[in-house]
């Protein structure tokens, strides 16, 4: 059976992402691993041009709320800067020297193609997650005597309308450690935007104003981990028609849901999204 195509907009959009460790194993325990995940998350996001609105890293899974910006042409100098962020200065210098040799030899087309291969990985949800998870898997396997895949299949994604839907998801993400009874308050958990913002993390604090983390999120919402589209009725209706092939051509009627005090609408979930 062919896997379902992922719902992705070609314009600026917000997404709720969840990815689990294979076999639900608790392989992400410990501060060293979680700190590394957060560092790699922001490096992959910078490389991809993605804005991390919120995150939480648990022992066997993580949640993200991200904004993928409009597609735009990225200058060569910016591509090279991002290569250094993701791969380090040594790799960046290698790329610069290689480009200089190609250009000195008059191979401008080959030099442009090399930059384009990196550029094509930027500004895209799937490429961002591929970069992030592959880099993390390589690091984990090398440092923790692990072999094979680290993750349980594809990540799940929920397309969000900016506004109440994003705010609700941010609140849900921040309250994960509270629901798991690890901490009493969301801001007491270090490996989330809520906790990092309290520790004066400027990147994390950008998403904190959206936080609605309170007792409304003390119950687990399965609907948020099944994928699809969430927002106002008009938003969900419009996009469910646009992405009708993702629903096997069947008309999908948005169903009302109440999340974090907000009245929203959702499509039916896509388990393999």
Sequence positions of predicted segments:
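Short Pro-Cys-Gly-centered "Cys-loop" motif that presents a nucleophilic cysteine in a tight turn
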Residues: 1-59, 67-273
């Amino acid at each position: 059976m062919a896997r379902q195509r992922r719902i992705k907009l070609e314009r600026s959009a917000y997404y709720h992402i969840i990815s689990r460790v294979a076999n639900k194993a608790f392989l992400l325990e410990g501060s060293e691993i979680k700190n590394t995940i957060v560092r790699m998350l922001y490096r992959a996001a910078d490389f991809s041009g993605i804005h991390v609105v919120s995150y939480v890293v648990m022992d066997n899974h993580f949640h993200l709320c991200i904004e993928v910006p409009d597609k735009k042409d990225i200058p060569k100098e910016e591509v090279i800067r991002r290569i250094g962020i993701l791969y380090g200065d040594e790799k960046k210098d290698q790329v610069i020297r290689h480009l200089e040799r190609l250009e000195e030899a008059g191979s401008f087309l080959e030099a442009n193609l090399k930059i384009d291969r990196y550029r094509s990985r930027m500004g895209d949800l799937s490429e961002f997650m591929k970069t992030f998870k592959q880099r993390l898997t390589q690091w984990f396997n090398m440092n923790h005597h692990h072999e094979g895949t680290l993750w349980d299949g594809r990540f799940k994604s929920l397309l969000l309308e900016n506004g109440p839907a994003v705010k609700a998801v941010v609140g849900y993400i921040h309250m994960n450690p509270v629901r798991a009874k690890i901490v009493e308050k969301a801001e007491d958990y270090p490996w989330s935007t809520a906790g990092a913002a309290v520790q004066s993390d400027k990147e994390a604090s950008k998403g904190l104003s959206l936080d609605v983390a309170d007792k409304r999120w003390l119950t687990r919402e399965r609907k948020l981990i099944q994928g699809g589209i969430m927002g106002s009725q008009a938003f969900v209706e419009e996009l469910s028609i646009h992405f009708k092939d993702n629903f096997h051509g069947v008309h999908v009627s948005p169903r009302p849901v109440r999340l974090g005090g907000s009245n929203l609408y959702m499509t039916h979930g896509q388990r393999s999204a």
